[in-house]
Amino acid sequence: MASTLPPLGGGNGGPHTQHSLPSLPAHLQSDTHITGHLASRFHVSHPTAKLSSHALVCLNTYTSSSKGPDGGKPGSAMAGAEDMADRAWIRLGHRSENQAVVFLGESGSGKSTIRSHLLTALLDKSSTPLSNKLSLAAYVFDSLTTTKTATTPTASKSGLFYELQYDTSATTNPILIGGKLLDHRLERSRIADVPTGERNFHVLYYLLAGTSQAEKTHLGLDDGASGSRRWKYLGHPTQLKVGINDSEGFQLFKTALKKLEFPRSDIAEICQILAAILHIGQLEFESTNNTSATGDDSGGFSHEGGQTSTTVRNKDVLGIIAAFLGVSMADLQSTLGYKTKMIQKERVTVMLDPAGARAHANELARTLYSLLVAWILESVNQRICAPEEDIANTISIVDFPGFAQQTATGSTLDQLLNNAATEAIYNFTLYNFFDRKAEMLESEEVSVAPTSYFDNSDAVKGLLKPGNGLLSILDDQTRRNKTDMQFLESLRKRFEGKNPAIEVGSATAKLPGSNFYTENAAASFTVRHFAGEVEYPVKGLIEENGEVVSVDLLNMFNSTKSEFVGRLFGQDVLQTVNHPIEKSTVMQATISSKPMRAPSVMSRKGGRGRGIASQRRQQESNLFDSGNTHAESRSPKGGNKGGIDQGASGQFLSSLDNVQKAVTDPGTNAYFVFCLKPNDRRIANQFDSKCVRTQVQTFGIAEISQRLRSADFSLFLPFGEFLGMADAETILVGSERERAEMVIEEKRWPSNEVQIGSTGVFLSERCWMEIAGLVDGSAAQGRFALPSSDGYGNDGATPGERDAFGASKEQLLSGGNTPLMYGEKGKPGYFGSDDARSEAGASAIGGGDMFKNFDTREQMAERGNEKNLEEIEEFKDSPSRKRWVFTVYFLTWFIPDFLIRWIGRMPRKDVRMAWREKLAINMLIWFMCLVAAFFIVVFPMLICPKQNVFSAAELSSHNGKDGNSAYVSIRGHVIDLGSFADRHYPSFVSRKTMLNYAGMDVSSLFPVQVSALCQGTDGSVDQTVTLDYKNTNMTGSPALINSQDLNAQYHDFRYFTNDTRPDWYLEQLIMLKGNYGKGTIGYSPEYIAKLGAKRQVIASIGSRVYDLTTYTVGGRRLRTKPGESLPSDPKLADFMDRKVVELFQNQAGGDITKFWNSLALAPDVKARMQTCLDHLFYVGDVDTRNSTRCKFAEYLVLAVSILLVSVIAFKFFAALQFGGKNVPENLDKFVMCQIPAYTEDEDSLRRAIDSAARMRYDDKRKLLVIICDGMIIGQGNDRPTPRIVLDILGVSETVDPEPLSFESLGEGLKQHNMGKVYSGLYEVQGHIVPFLVIVKVGKPSEVARPGNRGKRDSQMILMRFLNRVHYNLAMSPLELEMYHQIRNIIGVNPTFYEFMLQIDADTVVAPDSATRMVSAFLDDTRLIAVCGETALTNAKSSFITMIQVYEYYISHNLSKAFESLFGSVTCLPGCFSMYRIRAAETGKPLFVSREVVDSYATIRVDTLHMKNLLHLGEDRYLTTLLLKYHSKYKTKYLFSAHAWTIAPDSWKVFLSQRRRWINSTVHNLIELIPMAQLCGFCCFSMRFVVFIDLLSTVVQPVTIAYIVYLIVLVATKTTVVPITAFILLGAIYGLQAIIFILRRKWEMVGWMILYVMAVPVFSFGLPLYAFWHMDDFNWGTTRVVAGEKGKKVVISDEGKFDPSSIPRKKWEEYQAELWETQTSRDDSRSEISGISYGTKAQAVVSEYGFPSRPDSTTGFAAHALPYDSRNNSRMSLAHSDMGHHRMSQFGGSQFFNPDDMVGLPSDDALLAEIRDILKTADLMTVTKKGIKQELERRFDVPLDAKRAYINSGK
């Protein structure tokens, strides 16, 4: 029948000219020979071959893909792609079939390049503006999803299904009407994890390289010189310069978006998001202590300085990101610092460490990029996609990333899904060649010789089978929250021994050196893919498959101020699950791994008759879920109940199924392109036979070629159609079949290309084209030229456009230098040359700055920081507040508000007001400090100014011997001889000679010329007058040297000498006083009087002393030069006025100032006399240092010291409380022990809980109440704190009570909180203690730190509960459940509890502490609260803790003991204090009284004072309230009760803790001082204590200044007084030492030394730091603004709280309802509906029931349950018979339901059996446990419920 025509593509030029592989002879059809044939073609520049008409085999030449053997296009890969496009086009037009082109090949084989050539060729067929857009859309897709890898510069990292949509109904020339881009599974992991030597997605590099300088500045990309900043998300800096023209790429990217009709603003927003992603990579995190106090602070002593939190180090980068994303910096930082997860239906917040925060930031970057890509592609599709009903046919291009032997980015999931897709595509390829026509051939009775081939069905079924394939199992296990190991076990069950392609590894392994199996950390499964075996580790696979987007991020972006970011997060691609009750609350979200649209091939199955819009919507949704068992909600807000329906694998599977269905659709004709790499090293023109042979083998090209040799059928034509085409009307005889046979005989086609069936003819494509008259591509192109209309009503495309796309086939962008896979430049197929020319230069938009009309970054940031606020309450300021505000403004008026706003960066008015208040308080404190300093230092100096005088004894002590300085006096002036000696001229007088005069009066060495120094009575004195200088030579006067001293002659320049220099003396004296003066000689008033009595003419005027003795007793003489005669007038020597001389003589020895002032002398005479006195008779100054005034000043300093020490002495005596530590007898009072827990670790919590449980106090009368503040996983913990607590207490994870509402302390809606209640018995070291655990879980809408409201709120839960119990008020659901648990489960009426012990979760209490405290309460009924001594457990962990040890010791044993004397300890530490709940005699509530509870529950904390009270020192404030409202009661310190806590060990936390303490001290003491009733006898009262405390706190810095001042005094003066002061200060520590010596605390000696070294820190540094940081708070979002008529309005972004949203009932009403319900129902165990706040009811009494019971606690209340719970008169376990019976033995370890007793043996039967057992048992070895086990064996039932009876031995 068939002849032997020349085969397809034959030729005569040697073997390499044969381009069709099936046409090779049979002996050349092996892998090796085909590889050889490809090699021979490759070497002559023929890089392609064909598999008949079905497939193209392309070898990557790594040079140009458009050059053939002759340098032209023919023979090139490009020509091959165009040929395929021509044939697809012809079939599309002539047969109206859908066409699909499927690409296969490894990464680096050139798929993307061939794909672009093919797309270009197809779009060239209809050169319209739309084809331009479709080309640009492909470029945008590639920019976003391709990257450079180790194997290729353009590796696609997302599966592409690109659909070109045509209308073929009107003509054989199809009209292009649209396109659709479907991306499958972008490799998101690459964003934050760029493999070494590879790049991230190209668009990120484009952005960095292509933006102008102005744009870079706006985007924050311009740091430093170019290239100096290393971008974490861009890999190694070398990747920025790898020969890809990124700058040009960016211009093209923008151009493409612009031509795709993206608004300019959207393009700019896209760039901002990309920049934000780059910046997210730059964030650096550090672990810090958040020292700003907030209302929801929680935790114990060690946390008080601030919670450990993770913050961003580079805030500038954070600011840029926050601005672009439209959120506030604070929100962004805190959101990155924690992560909310779902753990077993519980929402838990994990406090992240820096590494965790970095991972969270990476997740943000991945989420943003994924959403951005999804949004851009969906926007592109909206612009290019035609309505489904208009589409007649499509051409689809399918190109998925190549097979991956190992993962580059570390994502196993990406690798698995990628390989599953290549497996599916390869399977379809095999199906197409081997099985697709098999059924039809069979039905047409055509037999074809079978061909063997490698079938990958096992792998495909194993991976992709819906329901129980590997991906489906992975999805199912993810949905059911299974672990990786459970997933592995599921795979084992499914595949072991059932599927040869999948091998499951072991879940356990033996570690080296161990004999035991442990969990295998490297557990994996292996899949035998068609391209090789791949081992996939399971670790982290389930979590990765969940791909859950952090709810925290969603929550943050809900309030974004950026409209664009809002659009990104509002897409359908982001699938959310909403809370079943609170619909607005998102519980979980994922980004879909499948495209948001489906292939049109499938969409059209719905029919064409309906309306366009509705039909399309219906089709989209039907299709979207095609192959998907769970219908997926596409509404972003809608969501479903049970969690996300599909994980990544399920979604990918579903989308892959859509692709397969589209390609295998009967109406679709598929072509294949096999891309091969000639070598692995990317070397041009090198052919590695081994490398190529492996690929030929992998893809089964030889088998396919053999198959085509026997059956190359592409079409089936019924006889009629075939004959019509063949123009066979001329053949008139025979049936249709016979006529067809005749035509075929005539055509002489080979038998493998044509076969006749029973109803028609099977043809190859070549034969069809021949018979249809479409012999080659050129004919096709020539024959089917475009018609005049382009289908859009235009007159066809302009010639220019058509030419452009004609030109665009090869090298489009002459300026480009982007190497593609084939080593060519440019972007093939995307841009016309016109586009390139017009817009490749400067930035396409906005003349170099696309952000020209945008908000600046600062404006964006400001917008992001704004909150949406609403009014929540109104109030008026109190008069005292108004007075204080006036004072503040009075003190700070000089600082204008705008300065605080701009320089202090405080936009909020309330924050600025707090700053003013802080400044005012600091000014007052500084003023008090200055007053104190003035009083200590300046005041004494004002009373007794400092005198530089030397007594005779002091002068003589400066004699230059024994290291003393050498001073001399000259006429009353003291000169430093030691300093002057070396400068004495002439130099022949030795220093030693000079120092002989030290300590003496050397006035005699300096004779004076009287006429030069005194002008006498009448204005002149005769030159011959001389005056001797004589000392009195008494013990009080300086020792005068002899006037005959030999050295005197050298200084004698008087008139009668040869060398007369009248002014020499005065000049020398001025020089010596100026340079070497030390002071003057001092004469005390007593000594002057003594001299006067001894006939000395000496007196003082003012402070100066004058001695006229020598003048009066003849010391005046007249002396002339030799040869001159003496003047005759003897009165020449009387140069002083007589009245002056007489005054001195008459008043000698006294102060004559008054007389001098009233002396009757002419003013000029008096002035001359004063000069004479000063120069000739002055001998020194009056020494007042021992006067009463100066003594007072000295002793004032001493008095202050004595005052300080007296207070300490008081404290010392207070501390000397000896007396034996008598251990009190057993007490029968009921005590609650409250432990608030926050983020402590398990060790701390266990220590605290165990120490409380092990206290030596009747276990039945203790109740541990542990309150967990929020569902939070602390740093370093592996579980949330509540779970740690419940695990310690032995509560099973299966116990899950209902969360119940209660009121909390919070802003706005945060006042509504929810909590869970657990109770049971805790067994530890022989103690069995009842416990109640309250877990604050928050409302479902709380995303961040759910339930967390702070330590004060935790205290309030119990305080408010007890308050409502004692006042019989209506309670919230949580409180009713607490009441029920305490009363009906634990069996004690809550009113019985008298005392509450509060300890912190990091505190350990001594075993006898509760007993000692309770006995103190019993001894003194006026005692309301008591605290014990707290020491440190971590004393030696750092220097910071070491300096605190002694301070803790003395603060308790001195300060608190001192305050305790007055019955007013002003600070009871929350870490270890006990309170009296109600008065012993009257039952009146004390600790939980209405006033205390209401004041402590203040929610509006908006002033500096309130914040310091309630946010800094809530413990101290609680004490303040007790003293304020119960002033007749006392608070005491009990030194015999001990606890140990953890102190801050880092400087920052220590600083913060002390800041809190100091400031809260100041503010609390200010609260206490105004209380009138606090004054007592002689002020020895509480107010005295408070005032002393406040004063000492405020002036602490001055005390240090005082000590420093004393040290300086001692150093400068050796007088006795400062030394006395030091002795006193030493006594302070001496007294302290006595205390610890008497207490035998010898180790305190060392700690004391450390403490003394740190005193400057404690007393000076810390207070000053604290006072200035008084306003360092986290101010929250609630703020106060001025309202009308003096009112203030509180506004908040938390929303307004409605108290009625929490239902409240009294216990009696609730119990009556409960009782009614229980009595009206059947005996069967039915559930109560309608009134239960709590868990399901199971027991007769308990409406809340036992699911909330742990499984390992005693039968504490087992027998009490049937008891009428209304009979509350005998509920005390101590005195009720029932209680006694129940408590007689703490056997048993469970709570039992009476219904559990059904089917158990009776007590009598048990007793009989026990007796029987004991008859034969060895009584020495028998145990209760053994007897119980034997009974269980005999009765064959578990007897846990009867354990108490068995153990009782009755």
UniProtKB/Swiss-Prot annotation:
Residues 656-680 are annotated as: Actin-binding. It is found in: Cell membrane; Cell septum; Cell tip. Residues 620-630 have a biased composition (Polar residues). Residues 1-779 form the Myosin motor domain. Glycans are attached at residues 245, 290, 427, 481, 558, 1033, 1058, 1186, 1453, 1559, 1767. Residues 1800-1850 form the DEK-C domain. It comes from the Eukaryota. GO terms for molecular function: actin binding; ATP binding; chitin synthase activity; cytoskeletal motor activity. The chain crosses the membrane at residues 884-904, 923-943, 1196-1216, 1568-1588, 1590-1610, 1617-1637, 1644-1664. It catalyses: [(1->4)-N-acetyl-beta-D-glucosaminyl](n) + UDP-N-acetyl-alpha-D-glucosamine = [(1->4)-N-acetyl-beta-D-glucosaminyl](n+1) + UDP + H(+). Its EC number is 2.4.1.16. ATP binds at residues 105-112. Disruption phenotype: Results in cell wall fragility, shows high sensitivity to Congo red and calcofluor white and leads to increased germination. Impairs appressorium formation, affects growth of in insecta produced hyphal bodies, and alters the surface properties of conidia and hyphal bodies, resulting in defects in the ability of the mutant strains to evade insect immune responses. The N-terminal myosin motor-like domain (MMD) does not seem to have motor activity but is indispensable for polarized cell wall synthesis via binding to actin that ensures the proper localization to the hyphal tips and septation sites near actin structures. This is Chitin synthase V. It comes from Metarhizium acridum (strain CQMa 102).
